[in-house]
From Swiss-Prot:
One of its GO terms (cellular component) is cytoplasm. Its EC number is 2.7.7.6. Residues 1-235 are annotated as: Alpha N-terminal domain (alpha-NTD). The N-terminal domain is essential for RNAP assembly and basal transcription, whereas the C-terminal domain is involved in interaction with transcriptional regulators and with upstream promoter elements. It is an enzyme of class 2 (transferase). Pfam families: RNA_pol_A_bac, RNA_pol_A_CTD, RNA_pol_L. Belongs to the RNA polymerase alpha chain family. Homodimer. In cyanobacteria the RNAP catalytic core is composed of 2 alpha, 1 beta, 1 beta', 1 gamma and 1 omega subunit. When a sigma factor is associated with the core the holoenzyme is formed, which can initiate transcription. GO terms for biological process: DNA-templated transcription. Keywords: DNA-directed RNA polymerase, Nucleotidyltransferase, Transcription, Transferase. It comes from the Bacteria. Residues 252-321 are annotated as: Alpha C-terminal domain (alpha-CTD). This is DNA-directed RNA polymerase subunit alpha.
Amino acid sequence: MAYQIECLETRVEEDQGQYGQFALHPLAPGQGITVGNALRRVLLSNLPGSAVTAVRIAGVNHEFSTIPGVREDVMDILLQMKQLVIRSHTSEPQMGRLFAQAPENEPLTVTAGMVQLGSEVEVVNPNHYIATLMPGATLEMEFKIEKDRGYRSVERVRDDRLALDYLQLDAVFMPVRRVNYTVDSVRSAGAEGDRQLQDYLKLEIWTNGSLTPQDALNQAATILVDLFSPLKEVPLHTSEATATDDHDETGQIPIEQLNLSVRAYNCLKRAQVNTVADLLEYSQEELLEIKNFGQKSAEEVIEALQKHLGITLPPQKAARN
């Protein structure tokens, strides 16, 4: 039986962020956590979003400057610009501009709604505060908007093509601010009337307003489908010769390369275990049968094989007919 998706609640927050609550049910036991965790990770890290990545302010050369007639210093203004919520309808970088001049007789509050943007870009939170200008003061700036995923620090990606007076910013492109999910076990009627235990997944999504929770969920689901679709047609080509060669090559590795302790090494040597191939003749249970070979030494060998070669010894002796 296919599960259903219900939208339980949606609302727009005071800061123009959006909230949505969804239910997915019925799911087989265990699938609630699988689906919820996968969606949560993709929602938080894989959805594209837009952000201000660089700002140039007239008369300012570095972020520790002050601007005459402006209450905030440059660092405060940059922090406010980072919190601008942008909806971009293009993947190309865009430029925005702001020119504000306070009247001679009163201060002026500068908000995001005063910025000038191209037709491909819009501000989602126009009431967002940027700065306060004293009477007669002027604030002029231009800024770069980019579209990307996740978080990008200036130290990791610095654009050397920008003019020197551009102040580059750490950018948060993630349009989804927060995701929460809960899984409840509920009983539903089965095919023969019996009450079967099912998972009921409740998913909560908070976005910055640049996209709706419904769109965010749709994009996340599409990403996961695209990620797993190729697995339906994976060609399973096996090469016995290659597999045998790899096994033989691994088997010839001397046990010295496992970096074992002196005690474990000497015990193996006395038991005529000289190579990995010799060691693979033993199960974890059989290692303990080697003279003077204790539990600690066995755990050391098992860990060394896994760490250096990715090999796991079988826990017990193989059954023989």
